[in-house]
């Protein structure tokens, strides 16, 4: 029911965020949601404008680029979520203060362990593991070896898990991957996605220096779809699968797609 359903949000571009404001907002949202917030953050994606974060008052430190600025904002945000006091109290406050240094309020206990980092490379997946963030790996990543997308993504997940173990965190990490999956069970499915499954991974440039590999769309009759998904190494390596849906096709059609996956695909693969 609604009481146990997670409230996932992803991904927030940290280049544009004030970590202190964001810690307040995230804490409030998690408390309102009863501790169900699963918050995805990242360094952001290619944009419509040049250096849009500058208009929000942010700039990288000397020698840093905007990606490093986004990661710095994330590190500050994570530190604030620990709820450890850092600000000196006013000796003559308007309202009585608790003893010691003050933290940001509202503080949501446990939210720190429900932050996910959207990693586009193996290096940032390792960095996220060291900081104790869960891993969110999408339908694209940096093309680091020239291998198939799912193989590179599975390697990224292994790299992340190894870094997590090395960091000595007490809890087990969460790992999600995203996929576009369409069981072809109706004429409409065939009309929309009948040819999509024949295309493989795509290669493209997401900025001047970054060659990326984009994962294929899975679209086939249910039996074939199950066989194809069984061979996806990254799905096997993750504990959570996020489904990307074509929002522009409307609520009813997307509900049909999800229902078809739950009925025709998930049981055969042991998904729940």
Predicted segments, located by residue:
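Short, small-residue-biased leader/transition segments that mark boundaries at the very start
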Residues: 1-7
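Conserved strand-turn element in the central/C-terminal portion of the radical SAM core barrel
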Residues: 8-15, 177-183
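Active-site mouth loops of central-metabolism enzymes
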Residues: 10-20, 109-119, 212-223
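Flexible, glycine-rich active-site loops centered on histidine and acidic residues
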Residues: 14-86, 135, 141-143
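Short, acidic/polar
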Residues: 25, 120-126, 222-232
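C-terminal amphipathic alpha-helical "assembly" element
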Residues: 38, 137-154, 158-272
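Extended catalytic-interface subdomain
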Residues: 65-109, 114-116
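A conserved active-site cap/scaffold subdomain adjacent to cofactor or substrate pockets
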Residues: 123-144
């Amino acid at each position: 029911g609604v009481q146990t359903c997670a409230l996932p949000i992803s991904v927030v571009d940290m280049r544009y965020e004030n970590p202190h404001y964001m810690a307040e907002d995230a804490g409030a949202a998690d408390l309102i949601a009863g501790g169900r917030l699963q918050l995805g953050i990242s360094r952001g994606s290619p944009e419509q404008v040049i250096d849009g974060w500058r208009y929000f008052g942010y700039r990288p430190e000397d020698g840093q680029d905007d990606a490093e600025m986004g990661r710095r904002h994330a590190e500050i945000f994570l530190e604030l979520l620990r709820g450890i006091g850092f600000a000196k109290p006013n000796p003559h406050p308007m309202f009585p203060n608790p003893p010691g240094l003050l933290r940001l309020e509202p503080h949501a206990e446990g939210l720190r362990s429900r932050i996910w980092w959207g990693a586009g490379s193996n290096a940032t997946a390792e960095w996220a593991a060291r900081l104790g963030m869960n891993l969110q790996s999408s339908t694209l990543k940096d093309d680091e070896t020239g291998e198939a997308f799912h193989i590179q993504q599975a390697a990224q997940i292994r790299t992340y898990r190894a870094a997590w173990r090395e960091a000595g965190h007490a809890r087990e990490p969460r790992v999600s991957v995203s996929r576009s999956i369409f069981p072809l069970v109706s004429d409409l499915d065939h009309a929309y996605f009948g040819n999509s499954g024949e295309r493989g991974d795509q290669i493209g440039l997401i900025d001047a220096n970054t060659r990326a590999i984009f994962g294929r769309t899975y679209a086939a009759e249910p039996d074939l779809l199950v066989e194809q998904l069984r061979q996806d190494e990254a799905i096997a390596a993750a504990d959570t699968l996020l489904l990307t849906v074509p929002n522009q096709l409307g609520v009813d059609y997307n509900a049909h797609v999800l229902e078809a996956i739950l009925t025709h695909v998930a049981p055969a693969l042991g998904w729940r």
